[in-house]
Swiss-Prot record:
Its cofactor is pyridoxal 5'-phosphate. This is Histidinol-phosphate aminotransferase. Homodimer. The gene is hisC. Pathway: Amino-acid biosynthesis; L-histidine biosynthesis; L-histidine from 5-phospho-alpha-D-ribose 1-diphosphate: step 7/9.
Length: 365
């Protein structure tokens, strides 16, 4: 066997396909509207901006390793026990910590066919095997998940609402899923878009976490709170899970600006409600306009839409993406999520929303 001539990553790392974010720029186009990352067009709360500026006056100090001010704000506004809250440098870090804590080679996780790519990446990084199950009509299929559970299953990941479809699983179905899982299997409910949902049969997961030992709810400040640049995520979980994750968490994983701005953002309920109202107005308008153009739109409860294009080559999603990009509108290609002929569009500023509709009207002539 030939000796390696340089350090080698552990087995399996080079088999992982790196996450590919949405594009940010279009060559030769000066003015672009980035509608590919589900960022809020209203931006963060003014109070969060002020807290961020104030945090800049103390950069010589280490942040609070427990992120106490942020956890306190989350606990107070959500009616939760602060001891059951763990904050991280974005939900991605927390997903990684969960997988490092609970997965080993030979273990399996279950993800759905259109699920968030990071679930698979972090599963593989931990040396475990992701098992993909089918969805039904662009919705999570509880029966398919339960049928996929084996003696090796350790974690089940579901995004609710789901990305990139924008669909959701009613709480009774989530409850049925949990009831069908063995007690040692961890159910992770990724509720990144929960604040946008205004449906009586939806619940983000607080109730299940509070009454069980094997459920984790994950949330983010990157969507409705408008702070993706600061990377703030949090989980609500049983104490034994929080304790285990804290044992391998970095001692200062949250920076001071993120702690301060996040605490201010989640306390500003008026800004959240303003963002919800804006989104509901334009989500409905965009859905109606795209449908009028003859495009199928997956019904969404989030701040984005999955737009399906005709089968003819001249009007495919790839052609539409090229057409829109040349006009300064960046949408998200979702072929990697199992939708080769669809684009995902964030609800953006009014001028961008109207501009995309006008551009697609011309494209489809």
């Amino acid at each position: 066997m030939q000796k390696p001539t340089r350090p080698q990553p552990k087995a399996g790392v080079l088999d992982i396909a790196a996450y590919v974010p949405g594009k940010e720029h279009v060559e030769g186009v000066a003015k672009v509207y980035k509608l590919s990352s589900n960022e809020t067009p209203l931006g963060p709360s003014p109070h969060a901006r002020e807290a961020y500026r104030h945090a800049g006056e103390k950069l010589e100090l280490y942040p609070d390793g427990q992120a106490l001010a942020l956890r306190q704000a989350i606990a107070e506004t959500q009616g939760l026990n602060i001891s059951n809250i763990l904050c991280g440098n974005g939900s991605d870090e927390l997903l990684g910590l969960l997988c490092q804590t609970y997965l080993a080679p030979g273990d399996e996780t279950i993800i759905t066919e259109h699920g968030f790519a990071v679930y698979k990446i972090q599963t593989l990084a931990a040396g475990a095997t992701p098992v993909t199950v089918k969805e039904k009509n662009e919705r999570i299929d509880v029966d398919a998940i339960l049928a996929g559970v084996t003696a090796r299953t350790k974690i089940v990941f579901i995004a609710n609402p789901a990305n990139p479809t924008g669909t959701y699983l009613p709480f009774e179905e989530v409850r049925r899923l949990h009831a069908g899982l063995p007690q040692h299997v961890l159910l992770v409910l990724d509720a990144a878009y929960a604040e946008y949902v205004r449906r009586n049969d939806y619940e983000a997961g607080l109730e299940l976490v509070s009454s069980n030992e094997n459920v984790v709810m994950m949330r983010t400040f990157s969507k409705i709170h408008g702070l993706p640049g600061l990377r703030i995520g949090w989980i609500y979980a049983p104490l034994h899970i929080i304790d285990a994750m804290n044992r391998i968490r970095g001692p200062f994983n949250m920076n001071s600006a993120a702690i301060a701005a996040g605490a201010a953002a989640i306390r500003d309920r008026a800004h959240v409600e303003k963002s919800v109202a804006y989104n509901e107005k334009w989500l409905a308008w965009l859905t109606e306009e795209f449908t009028r153009l003859g495009l199928r739109v997956t019904p969404s409860v989030t701040n984005f839409l999955l737009i399906h294009f005709p089968d003819d080559a001249a009007h495919s999603a790839d052609k539409a993406d090229e057409w829109l990009s040349r006009r300064g509108y960046i949408l998200r290609r979702v072929g990697g999520y199992g939708f080769p002929n669809a684009l995902r569009m964030t609800v953006g500023p009014e001028e961008a929303n109207r501009g995309v509709v006008a551009a697609l009207t011309e494209f489809l002539k």
